[in-house]
Regions:
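A non-catalytic, helix-rich entry segment at domain boundaries
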Residues: 45-117
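Metal-dependent nuclease catalytic regions and adjoining charged, substrate-binding loops involved
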Residues: 174-262
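Active-site-proximal structural scaffolding
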Residues: 3, 129, 162-165, 169, ...
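Hydrophobic (often cysteine-bearing) scaffold residues that line and stabilize catalytic clefts
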Residues: 38, 42, 46, 91, ...
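Nuclease catalytic cores
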Residues: 10-58, 118
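Short small-residue beta-strand/loop micro-motif enriched in glycine and branched aliphatics
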Residues: 30-32, 147, 155-158, 197-200
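Active-site-adjacent bridging/hinge elements
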Residues: 18-25, 144-149, 222-223
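Non-catalytic protein-protein interaction segments used by genome-maintenance enzymes to assemble
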Residues: 116-174, 192
Length: 262
């Protein structure tokens, strides 16, 4: 049976091979307990509300009340972000306020006709498979297929980061051909905390480049397995100008138990 990979799984390997080994290869009974983070809880909670809206379970005017009523029970972890070795910030109030304002002002997607929300896929891609969940599939006013991924990020830090994340949309575009019989005409990230849209016109060449990237990462994973056998992969340390990147380490699911964490 072919191994199936999600975009997040491939991205984790590129971020830290040791974390990847712990999450996907180490014996389950030996893995340390995974840690969450308030920002991830927030993103999942808002995704859930938008999913309920997309399925017709919540109307626009009900979303804010639902957000207020269920926020605490859905946020299991704190929002503290370690910025440097000696400085951290608690972002709970900021995230809560951003979510409140978003759902307060949300007026739906009047320019779209929703086809599906949180559509799962697991499709063949050569020597491996790709899986995932498309947040929103819809048709625009011209009847063209569009794919939307919700992001709780406020913005992309750079054009390079935006283009790197666009690979996720192109994985979804590839799956759309099997799911709907056509490629989308446009792809978008909806940065809901700031109510901003980041659009991409579909480019088949860019999609093929993304599939080639997926294949190269899968190949590297297999090479690491052969190299290390049953031993852990070596970590990749995120750095900024040679210093440990405390910010990125906030989101590692094994940060407290990791022997490499500073």
């Amino acid at each position: 049976m072919k191994e199936s990979y999600s975009f997040s799984r491939l991205k984790m390997f590129g971020s830290c091979k040791y974390a990847y080994w712990q999450n996907y290869i180490e014996d389950k009974d030996k893995r340390p307990e995974k840690e969450g983070h308030g920002t991830s809880d927030f993103g999942n909670f808002c995704h859930d509300i938008l999913e309920r809206y997309g399925k017709g379970e919540l109307a626009e005017w009900e979303m804010l009340d639902y957000y207020e009523a269920h926020f605490s029970e859905n946020i299991k972890n704190d929002f503290v972000l370690q910025m440097t070795e000696n400085f951290s910030r608690d972002m709970r109030s900021k995230y809560y306020d951003d979510g409140y304002e978003f759902f307060k002002e949300f007026e739906g997607f009047p320019d779209f006709s929703i086809i599906s929300t949180e559509k799962r896929f697991d499709v063949d891609c050569g020597d491996f498979r790709l899986n995932g969940k498309i947040d929103l599939t819809a048709r625009d006013e011209a009847g063209k297929l569009i794919i939307v991924d919700y992001k709780s990020k406020s913005k992309f830090k750079s054009k390079a980061e935006r283009e790197d994340y666009a690979k996720q949309l192109y994985v979804y575009a590839y799956a759309a051909k099997e799911l709907y019989g056509e490629y989308p005409s446009r792809l978008a990230f909806f940065m809901f905390r700031t109510n901003q849209w980041v659009w991409f016109d579909f480019d088949e060449t860019r999609m093929q480049e993304t599939l080639d990237w997926c294949a190269s990462v899968v190949k590297e994973i297999e090479e690491e397995k052969e190299k290390f056998g049953d031993k852990p992969f070596e970590p990749i340390e995120e750095t900024i100008y040679g210093d440990f990147n405390f910010y990125e380490a906030n989101f590692c699911p094994f940060r407290s138990s990791c022997k490499y964490h500073h």
